[in-house]
């Protein structure tokens, strides 16, 4: 029994939640007889995935800021949804190009000097402003490990790496309320189980005032925008830096948030 348990739990020991290879590394198949489908891939059985999903769900619900656990939950529960998202990308010219070229978003791939030189009001400057004000880095996104399909692994990696861009588009900060609003938008957009769980259970820690604002104004706004917008995975954001933020919002059908949520928890 002990030997069986060690075998089942081996991926848990292998997973440390730490940084993977630089995001500039191409997301391509690397098997060559190793059984690995892409960098950082950890092959897992169905039982191992069930255990990983259960454990990560519990930790993510207890502490929504455990991004490593949220990442594992997304990888172990979203295969069917990832296939739907992948097919949506393949049917869209811009999405298909992203799937083919596999761009990555990190400090090593972004030209920060160029972003700083862009005019105020551009999408690139808005994204840079979001990073600076909230003191976040694109390098903090966990690498995909437990998706046993190289193409689907890239889809969820891409979803993670554009998360901060969605914050900038939606005008949401990184406080608890802002993250929950973005998760509602992402849940409607992607249908990923971990987005749905985060959207439903994230508000547990909110104050009564923030919860009231969330339910009465912010959730309806996020749901409406999520339904109206085309698939956000089909936008080649790296080629939209110079586009005015308002023009990109209009293209995607994203309206201004009904209120500012900075300082609300």
Swiss-Prot record:
Reaction equations catalysed: 4-hydroxy-3-methoxy-5-(all-trans-decaprenyl)benzoate + H(+) = 2-methoxy-6-(all-trans-decaprenyl)phenol + CO2
GO molecular function annotation: 4-hydroxy-3-methoxy-5-polyprenylbenzoate decarboxylase activity
Enzyme Commission number, as recorded: 4.1.1.130
UniProt enzyme class: lyase
Membrane topology: Peripheral membrane protein
GO cellular component entries: extrinsic component of mitochondrial inner membrane; mitochondrial inner membrane; mitochondrion
Pathway: Cofactor biosynthesis; ubiquinone biosynthesis
Modified residues (Phosphoserine): 108
Known cofactor(s): Zn(2+)
Subcellular location: Mitochondrion inner membrane
UniProt keyword annotation of Lyase present: yes
Residues involved in Zn(2+) binding: 163-164, 167, 179
A GO biological process held by the record: ubiquinone biosynthetic process
Keywords: Lyase, Membrane, Metal-binding, Mitochondrion, Mitochondrion inner membrane, Phosphoprotein, Transit peptide, Ubiquinone biosynthesis, Zinc
First and last residues of the transit peptide: 1-29
Cited function: Lyase that catalyzes the C1-decarboxylation of 4-hydroxy-3-methoxy-5-(all-trans-decaprenyl)benzoic acid into 2-methoxy-6-(all-trans-decaprenyl)phenol during ubiquinone biosynthesis.
Similarity comment: family membership: Belongs to the COQ4 family.
Stored PANTHER family: UBIQUINONE BIOSYNTHESIS PROTEIN, UBIQUINONE BIOSYNTHESIS PROTEIN COQ4 HOMOLOG, MITOCHONDRIAL
Assembly, per entry: Component of a multi-subunit COQ enzyme complex, composed of at least COQ3, COQ4, COQ5, COQ6, COQ7 and COQ9.
Protein name: Ubiquinone biosynthesis protein COQ4 homolog, mitochondrial
UniProt organism field: Bos taurus
């Amino acid at each position: 029994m002990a030997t069986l348990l060690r075998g089942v739990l081996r991926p848990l020991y292998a997973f440390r939640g730490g940084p993977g290879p630089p995001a500039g590394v191409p997301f391509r198949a690397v098997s060559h007889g190793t059984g690995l489908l892409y960098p950082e891939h950890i092959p897992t059985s169905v039982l191992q995935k069930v255990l990983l999903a259960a454990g990560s769900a519990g930790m993510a619900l207890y502490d929504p800021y455990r991004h490593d656990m949220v990442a594992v939950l997304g990888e172990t529960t979203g295969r069917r949804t990832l296939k739907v998202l992948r097919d949506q990308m393949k049917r869209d010219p811009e999405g298909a190009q992203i799937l083919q070229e596999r761009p990555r978003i990190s400090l090593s791939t972004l030209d920060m000097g160029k972003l700083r030189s862009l005019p105020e009001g551009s999408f690139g400057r808005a994204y840079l402003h979001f990073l600076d004000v909230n003191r976040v880095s694109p390098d903090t996104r966990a690498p995909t490990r437990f998706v046993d399909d190289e193409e689907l692994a890239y889809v969820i990696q891409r979803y993670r790496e554009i998360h901060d861009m969605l914050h900038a588009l939606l005008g949401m900060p990184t406080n608890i309320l802002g993250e929950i609003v973005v998760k509602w938008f992402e849940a409607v957009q992607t249908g990923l189980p971990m987005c749905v769980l985060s959207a439903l259970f994230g508000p547990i820690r909110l104050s009564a005032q923030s919860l009231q604002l969330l339910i009465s104004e912010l959730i309806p706004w996020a749901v409406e925008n999520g339904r109206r917008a085309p698939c956000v995975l089909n936008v080649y954001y790296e080629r939209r830096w110079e586009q005015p933020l308002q023009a990109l919002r209009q293209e995607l059908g994203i309206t201004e948030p009904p209120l500012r949520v900075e300082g609300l928890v």
